[in-house]
Swiss-Prot record:
Belongs to the DnaA family. It comes from Lawsonia intracellularis (strain PHE/MN1-00). The lineage of its organism: Bacteria, Pseudomonadati, Thermodesulfobacteriota, Desulfovibrionia, Desulfovibrionales. Residues 355-478 are annotated as: Domain IV, binds dsDNA. Residues 72-136 are annotated as: Domain II. Keywords: ATP-binding, Cytoplasm, DNA replication, DNA-binding, Lipid-binding, Nucleotide-binding. InterPro entries: Chromosome_initiator_DnaA, Chromosome_initiator_DnaA-like, DnaA_C, DnaA_dom, DnaA_N_dom, DnaA_N_sf, P-loop_NTPase, Trp_repressor/repl_initiator. Residues 137-354 are annotated as: Domain III, AAA+ region. This is Chromosomal replication initiator protein DnaA. SUPFAM superfamilies: P-loop containing nucleoside triphosphate hydrolases, TrpR-like. NCBIfam families: DnaA (TIGR00362). Oligomerizes as a right-handed, spiral filament on DNA at oriC. Plays an essential role in the initiation and regulation of chromosomal replication. ATP-DnaA binds to the origin of replication (oriC) to initiate formation of the DNA replication initiation complex once per cell cycle. Binds the DnaA box (a 9 base pair repeat at the origin) and separates the double-stranded (ds)DNA. Forms a right-handed helical filament on oriC DNA; dsDNA binds to the exterior of the filament while single-stranded (ss)DNA is stabiized in the filament's interior. Domain I is involved in oligomerization and binding regulators, domain II is flexibile and of varying length in different bacteria, domain III forms the AAA+ region, while domain IV binds dsDNA. GO terms for cellular component: cytoplasm; plasma membrane.
């Protein structure tokens, strides 16, 4: 038995202890592994599987590999379209040894259009550290080709495409919207497009969140390497920064970002910024910085209408290499009226259920999946949100209006702020008035919820699960 076989088998042993049997069978079993130059390469059967593992299982995989290799082996995942001629091992031998009869997806009857399966290997290194490395043209997840344009986002889409033109009318774009409506998609699409059309072999592109920007700056201060930090972000062709609202109240970081944007605009570079809030809604942000935000083009993104949702569902199904019938697409579009992440999640669950049951996607199956997301009796207002959140947290709704700073009350209130902002037409001021809080308190609370979810901390995962449960079972989004 080779070292590679031993390594992968040990990793699988560890993963079986960490993951549920169903998760291991569906996502880990189809992988093929090989080792080269001290790295473990994992080959997924499709782009969908690779992206799913990248988003949900990479922490478990990297921890298991680190445990087995003593922290010496790095991990990369690719689509199995051109596996190199290296010693490989799939779960076939491993499962035979362990007497596990299942070693991949069942032969499914789901309609598949092979023209939608990527023919190129897309390699994505599984991140280990907090700070992202600069993106290359091969590591962008989203592109303009996969963005569905509708009345809700056509202006933002046109503005984003304008950013990659030589004749761009502005050099700064500020995108704002509620969570899950396409800000990240458009931001990455700008980066991907610039990398593809640039006449330079390696255009300088920086893509990160405002929190990661802060972490980089703090690290440069600790290592006394501020000049390197400034050189990295001020000498770039395209600067993509998400979640600007994280910088509220952080004066030093605002000064650094202001200097960075000034430098970039001075050298003719392009800047794309995103936030859950429009510049005028930001609090405790330097007026000079807000002025810089407003000096470019401001574009908001709204919730998609039924027709746009239908087209998004069809497009997301193509990512899974599945052809969705018009009837099922229309049904889902009418029932799922939340954000785009909800549409993605429903399609993922629908496809996975069809594969696990080895059957075609039918209207009955769609209705079963929809039942996890909506109720037959729709209701949506601040009162229903307060009722649902207080019940989920085991708190009396009346006490949420108090001035208590106990952690449970703070998290529950912030969750209400987040849901009200995301799923109602209430302004930040109106939400604050309901709880006798200031506009800035509501904004800060929403930002804290988003930050914990993005960090995927224990608290963040708990909040995300609570939000998911509430949105599926207690609230009909409209």
């Amino acid at each position: 038995m080779s070292y590679m076989n031993t390594t992968w088998e040990k990793v699988c042993d560890s993963l079986q202890k960490r993951l549920s049997p169903g998760t291991f069978k569906v996502w880990i079993a189809p992988l093929v592994a090989s080792e080269h130059d001290g790295q473990l390469f994992l080959y997924a059967p499709s782009l969908f599987v690779m992206n799913w593992i990248q988003e949900r299982l990479f922490v478990d995989i990297t921890e298991a590999v680190s445990e087995v290799s003593g922290g010496t082996m790095k991990v990369q995942i690719e689509v199995k379209s051109s596996v190199p001629d290296k010693p490989q091992v799939s779960l076939t031998d491993y499962n035979n040894k362990q007497h596990i009869p299942y070693n991949g997806f069942p032969n499914t009857k789901v309609s598949i259009s092979r023209s939608h399966i990527s023919s190129q290997t897309e390699q994505l290194p599984l991140p280990v550290s907090l700070v992202k490395a600069p993106f290359s043209s091969r590591s962008w997840r989203y592109s303009f080709d996969s963005f569905v344009v509708g009345p809700c986002n056509n202006l933002a889409h046109a503005a984003a495409q304008n950013m990659i033109k030589d004749t761009a009318s502005v050099d700064t774009l500020f995108l704002s919207s509620g969570p899950g409506l396409g800000k990240t998609h458009l931001t990455q699409a700008v980066g991907q497009a610039l990398c593809n059309i640039s006449n330079r072999a390696n255009p300088k592109v920086e893509y990160l969140t405002a929190e990661e920007f802060c972490s980089c700056f703090v690290q440069s201060l600790r290592t006394k390497n501020v000049d390197s930090f400034k050189g990295r972000f001020r000498d770039t062709d395209l600067f993509l920064l998400e979640d600007i609202h994280f910088l509220q109240g952080k004066e030093k970081m605002q000064d650094e970002l202001l200097a960075t944007i000034r430098s970039l605009q001075g050298r003719g570079s392009r800047v794309v910024l995103t936030s859950s809030f429009a510049p005028k809604e930001l609090k405790n942000v330097d007026n000079r910085l807000v002025s810089r935000f407003c000096s470019g083009f401001l574009a908001g993104i709204e919730k998609p209408n039924a027709e746009t949702r239908r087209r998004i569902l069809i497009e997301k199904a193509k990512v899974h290499a599945v052809v969705l019938s018009e009837a099922v697409a229309d049904f889902l579009a009418m029932k799922l009226v939340g954000d785009i992440r909800q549409l993605e999640s429903s399609i993922s669950n629908l496809v996975l259920k069809a594969k696990l049951l080895d059957c075609m996607i039918s209207m009955d199956m769609a209705k079963d999946v929809i039942a996890q997301y909506t109720q037959d009796d729709p209701f949506m207002n601040i009162d229903s949100i307060i009722h649902a959140v207080s019940g989920s947290f085991g708190l009396q709704a009346e006490k949420l209006y108090s001035r208590s700073r106990k952690q449970d009350f703070v998290v529950a209130r912030n969750t209400i702020f987040y849901l009200a902002r995301k799923h109602t037409d209430m302004s930040l001021q109106e939400i604050g008035d309901r709880f006798h809080r200031r506009h800035s308190t509501v904004l800060k609370g929403i930002a804290s919820i988003e930050r914990e979810i993005q960090r995927k901390s224990p608290t963040g995962r708990q909040i995300a699960n609570t939000l998911n449960l509430l949105e599926r079972t207690n609230i009909h989004l409209n």
